[in-house]
Amino acid sequence: MKTATAVINRRALRHNLQRIRQLAPDSQVVAIVKANAYGHGMIEAAHTFCDADCYGVARLSEALALRAAGITKPIVLLEGFFSADDLPLLVEHQLETAVHSPEQLAALEQATLSQPLRVWMKLDTGMHRLGVLPEHADAFWQRLTACRNVVQPVNIMSHFSRADEPEAGTTERQLTCFDAFTQGKPGAQSIAASGGILLWPQSHRDRVRPGIILYGVSPLDNEDAAHFGFQPAMTFTSHLIAVREHHTGEAVGYGGTWTSPRNTRLGVVAVGYGDGYPRCAPAGTPVLINGREVPLSGRVSMDMITVDLGPDAQDKVGDEVILWGPTLPVERIAAHTGASAYELITRLTQRTALEYVDGE
């Protein structure tokens, strides 16, 4: 019997990439495959996104793994390089890099490289995490344009902090700041990630950088991805390993936090926080068994959860349990837990098997 398994639908991944192209028809697509492709398996996802124009990762190790797997299209290091010692590897593997700090700029100026690198100057328009502040941006850009180790023209990127909020004045101010700096400068521009693609079409520019939306999960709190025409690619499943008679007033699980208000049947599911199911999921969080939703009962354990099947349930050991997927969106589970959907799909552990299908 299978236990925790994440089934990844390649057809859904391809559909989502094409949906991005429909929403941003004049932009190239940087498929973001960092963090193991948001839990979907980086190598498999990258090959499935073979029609993307480029890939985006957060770590040099991710980029090198893609190259080792035969990915030849451009790859952008979204956080840049972390040490001057990394620069020869970037040249060897033809990687593009963000440049956001004085230390990175100095390393580029001082390096002896066999050929120049394509770079993306990261402008801090309001995220205040990485990036060159606007008051320092012109001087920084001038040094990059004069650097012998940089392919010209210099590309420019930034990142929205609140693009998932339709009325956020912050996004408009960030876009105004970006426009003021990029006006008249050559090179590609990129500022829109998933939220910007969905809600701010004026931000699409030369390249868009879809992340979570590529996997059929919404970046918005109040709408799931299906509302925008995307298909969830992951179905997280396990199976019932026990069905037990449970009596009124009996508690279940660690701490006895849930007590049955009636005689019922409890199902024990072979999944827990050791597989990546959220430990913070409260009683009442739904799972799907035999086409109906049933509520979580008691605390999530490392290896198991218990669910209230109901007094007349006919479910049996071996029946499949859907924890999230197209028929039970992960956004709903996130709402129950107080965690974000980003967390849920990226926290699956090595014990959860990844399987790939090309079906509906």
Curated annotation (Swiss-Prot):
Listed InterPro entries: Ala_racemase (IPR000821), Ala_racemase/Decarboxylase_C (IPR009006), Ala_racemase_C (IPR011079), Ala_racemase_N (IPR001608), Ala_racemase_pyridoxalP-BS (IPR020622), PLP-binding_barrel (IPR029066)
EC main group: isomerase
PROSITE patterns in the record: ALANINE_RACEMASE
EC number: 5.1.1.1
Protein's UniProt keywords contain Amino-acid biosynthesis: no
UniProt GO BP: D-alanine biosynthetic process
Superkingdom of this protein's organism: Bacteria
Residues forming coiled coils: none
SMART domains the record matches: Ala_racemase_C
Binding locations of substrate: 129, 302
Isomerase keyword on record: yes
Pathway annotation from the record: Amino-acid biosynthesis; D-alanine biosynthesis; D-alanine from L-alanine: step 1/1
Molecular functions per Gene Ontology: alanine racemase activity; pyridoxal phosphate binding
Reported cofactor(s): pyridoxal 5'-phosphate
Keywords: Isomerase, Pyridoxal phosphate
Catalytic activity: L-alanine = D-alanine
Active site: 34 (proton acceptor), 254 (proton acceptor)
Modified residues (N6-(pyridoxal phosphate)lysine): 34
Recorded GO CC terms: cytosol
Family listed: Belongs to the alanine racemase family.
Protein's job: Catalyzes the interconversion of L-alanine and D-alanine. May also act on other amino acids.
Official protein name in the record: Alanine racemase
